[in-house]
Regions:
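Acidic, two-metal ion nucleic-acid-processing modules in DNA metabolism proteins
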Residues: 1-95
């Protein structure tokens, strides 16, 4: 299943990654910091890194996946799409 959440913010550590810095590695929490930071990965969405690291709220669609990075295993979000909260209503009406 694909999930959607809103009002997420950078929890420190979000950055562009990949050979051409085109992907986004996220460390995020909700706007009220009620949840522990989550890790996520977004292919081709590094263009959002500057706005996210300025703590602008964002929404995302994602799948859950298990990351097996020896010796640990943890859940991470495989981000399918992402947008800033300020763009969300416009993007929803376009569909």
């Amino acid at each position: 299943p694909i999930f959607m959440t809103r009002s997420m913010r950078d929890a420190g550590g979000t950055r562009a990654v990949g050979k051409a810095l085109q992907h986004l590695s996220l460390r995020m929490t909700d706007s009220y910091q009620r949840i522990r930071p989550l890790h996520g990965f977004a292919l081709g969405l590094a263009r959002y890194a500057p706005e996210i690291t300025r703590h602008n709220a964002f929404a995302l669609c994602f799948e859950l996946e298990e990351n097996n990075f020896y010796p640990q295993s943890f859940l991470q979000l495989r981000v399918k799409d992402l947008c800033l909260e300020s763009e969300l209503s416009e993007r929803l009406t376009d569909r």
